[in-house]
Amino acid sequence: MSKLFEANGTLASPSPPQELATAVRAPARVVSSGYSHGGASYAKKSMIGWRSTTTDADEDIVENIETLRARSRMLYMTAPIATGALKTIRTNVVGSGLSLNSQIDAGFLGMSDEEASDWEANTEREWRLWADSVMCDVERRQNFYQLQSLVMLSTLMSGDCFVITPMIRRVGSVYDLRVGIIEADRVCNPKDNLEALKKNILGGIEVGKYGEAIAVYVANRHPGATARSTDTLEVKWSRVPIFGDRTGRRNVLHIMTDVERPAQRRGVPILAPVIEELKQLKRYSDAELMAAVISGMFTVFVTTPSPDESGLFGGGGGLPAMQCIDPDPQAYELGNGAIVRLAEGEKVEIADPKRPSVAFDGYVQAVCRHIGAALEIPYELLLKHFTSSYSASRAALLEAWKMFRMRREWLVSSFCQPVYEEWLAEAVSKGRINAPGFFADPAIRAAWSGAEWHGDAQGQLDPLKEANAAVIRVQNGFSTISREAAEMTGMRMDSIVRTRAREEALLKSAGLNAAGGTLPVEEEKEEKDE
């Protein structure tokens, strides 16, 4: 860089132009470094108009959540792809319901395997007494397995939902625990903004000094709904502590979709990243459908040359009444085999829509691939379009089941297991289940509360290949019979063994051959990928 002053303080001689240009560009090289040449650039033409800001999760999510919920629900109700995506996740994650498989820590509790098995069987029997009945529901509409489906679908659609666990006595019910599902919209800020600011309430959730949720504010009705009783003429809010102050009992379960950021209070609808794509696809599909319908219409327009002429068929007397459409001065209507009379001098020119469009299917497939990538649902499963080879279809299902298993574990830890632990505490306190030390030591309580939850199996594209693969895994010690039985059929191994024993005894008593066997299997040649 050239000098501006000499050592004696006099002004230095002018530098050559190239040196001055270098001196001016030097600071720019320091500032324009690293990501400023790429994603952080404001100089590139592709980035120059992109302005973005950073803020916390509450600003990004809670301030926009009402719009996201409304649009997500509208897409679920009107867009087939959105409806299919949510129902596909719900059906594969929950299916007919996740069933309890009690698994206590027998070694820690000092129990033999036989004693533990008896205790688990009795506990599952008592659990079914409560879970299989609609009495478990606050509204007495659904059993526990149907509530799982509602929780999953509501959470996917709205971003989150809330579950309350009140104790309500009812005639004919052994247990008092009830499960109530609260839609996301009902948990919102009270009208008193000053009070909400004092207590750090946002999105209807009050947080403490460490950022922990300590209470939710529940409206007595949906804020956007019409009052249907005198009790709900005015929207009022109730503060519900998430944990009991005296016992620490869970009063509220916050079932939330993927937590994306620290200090996030509310969940985001799963369709949020693809709302625009789904809406545009819906508009395009509607336009193509209407164009195809119009191109399929056959309508005859009759032009009358002058008022004196009687027109086609002698004044229209030969036309069936159902085929005649009285002209509207504002519009004409197309119909199937319809005949429309035109006024004197009027003519009709119809543009050929050239439908169906040959590009429609390709465009829909391309957009659905993008949507499926965001939702973690392979394109084949999103559209139920399995036309590729066995290997490609199986790869798509395996990829999808990574997500289904993750969401199944999430549902278990967020909803099923906490509700089971609340029910077990009541069963022990009522003396219907014997669990020594349950309330004395948290470690003992956790040992009694151990459980696994099994749902519907994944399903198989080629049952023969899947069964042979399972046999090989078990024979070589890579897996267990219990695990393979659960993954292939959704059933527990001990249940299968007991059922088979009864079946074989029944067959023998009838004089039938109860022996099973396997036939030699010739592996089919793997299909080549298309």
Which residues are covered by each model-predicted region?
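Surface-exposed loop-to-helix/strand elements on domain peripheries
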Residues: S117, V134, A338-L461
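Short, Φ-rich (hydrophobic/aromatic) sequence segments
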Residues: M77, I81-F108, L147-L156, L271-E288, ...
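C-terminal anchoring/interaction modules
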Residues: S2-A23, C368, A395, W410-E530
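Charge-rich, acidic-biased intrinsically disordered regions
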Residues: Q142-Q148, I164-I182, P307-P327, V419-G455, ...
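Short coil/turn segments at secondary-structure boundaries
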Residues: Q142, P166-M167, A291-M297, L382-F386, ...
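Extended, charged amphipathic alpha-helical segments
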Residues: R246-S393
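N-terminal-proximal low-complexity accessory segments that begin disordered
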Residues: M1-S112, E530
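Structured, mid-chain assembly/scaffold modules that mediate subunit interfaces
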Residues: T88-I255, R473
